[in-house]
């Protein structure tokens, strides 16, 4: 079990607003609305992505034809702010060794270099990191902490940041070599983890590995970081 520290209107960074991140942002605003409706303060979000919307993104990612050519993080956040009366923020890419003031980081990037940038950032030891990834029909969502009680996802799974970049276009694939629902499924699991962090005092599970083609999933039980 992991005892969750109480988070008051947490700041959530969503890093990467493509195939997974664009859906994650929309899932988080649902969490915010549900929390506010129950008398809580909700959450704040800052979205990061340096890319612009392409025609090939429409359909797989949470964008519309009129968004083409616009910065991804900008169009997502401005749409949410307009419809929900919020003041969430957006910007381009996260910089290496950047100072982070987030309670929760959701990593929706698809390169080792981008994950290294997140790992190198200056953040609080207890910052929660939700690491997302997917392949053709499978994916994983893992919750950890920078240097807190839960393992850091990048130390726990070194292959996320070490070695050569895999070949292929990842989530940017315009030819739908990945199953269409896979990014949305990752986003749903992210929503569940954030909901648990905000609504529960203890976590028995902190992630999942799934395969949509096999209709299979395996939860990751919570284990505390071992002392040296």
PLM regions: where:
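Glycine-rich phosphate/adenylate-binding loop
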Residues: 1-20, 24, 100-101, 112-115, ...
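Alpha-helix termini
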Residues: 3, 30-41, 123-124
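Glycine-rich adenosine-cofactor-binding loop
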Residues: 8-38, 46-54
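Residue-level recognition of the N-termini of beta-strands and the immediately preceding loop/turn
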Residues: 10, 41-45, 88, 127
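N-terminal Rossmann-like NAD(P) cofactor-binding subdomain of oxidoreductases
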Residues: 39-40, 48, 109, 121-122, ...
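Glycine-rich phosphate-binding loop and adjoining beta1-alpha1-beta2 segment
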Residues: 41-84
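A structured beta-alpha segment of the ubiquitous adenosine-cofactor-binding alpha/beta core
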Residues: 68-102, 109-114
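N-terminal Rossmann-like NAD(P) cofactor-binding module of classical short-chain dehydrogenase/reductase
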Residues: 106-107, 130
């Amino acid at each position: 079990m992991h005892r969750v520290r109480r988070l008051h209107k947490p700041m959530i960074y969503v890093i990467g607003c493509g195939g997974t991140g664009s859906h994650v942002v929309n899932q988080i605003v649902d969490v915010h609305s549900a929390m506010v409706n129950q008398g809580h303060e909700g959450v704040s979000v800052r979205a990061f992505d340096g890319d612009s919307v392409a025609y090939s993104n429409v359909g797989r990612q949470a964008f519309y034809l009129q968004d083409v050519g616009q910065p991804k993080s900008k169009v997502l956040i401005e749409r949410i702010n307009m419809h929900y009366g919020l003041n969430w923020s957006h910007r381009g890419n996260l910089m290496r060794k950047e100072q982070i003031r987030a309670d929760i980081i959701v990593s929706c990037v698809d390169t080792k270099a981008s994950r290294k940038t997140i790992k190198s950032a200056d953040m609080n030891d207890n910052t929660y990191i939700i690491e997302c990834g997917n392949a053709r029909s499978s994916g994983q969502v893992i919750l950890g902490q920078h240097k807190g009680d839960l393992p850091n996802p990048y130390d726990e799974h070194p292959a996320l940041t070490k070695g050569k970049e895999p070949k292929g276009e990842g989530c940017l694939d315009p030819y739908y070599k990945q199953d269409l629902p896979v990014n949305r499924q990752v986003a749903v699991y992210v929503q569940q983890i954030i909901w648990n962090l905000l609504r529960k005092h203890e976590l028995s599970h902190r992630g999942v590995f799934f395969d949509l083609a096999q209709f299979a999933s395996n939860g990751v039980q919570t284990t505390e970081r071992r002392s040296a």
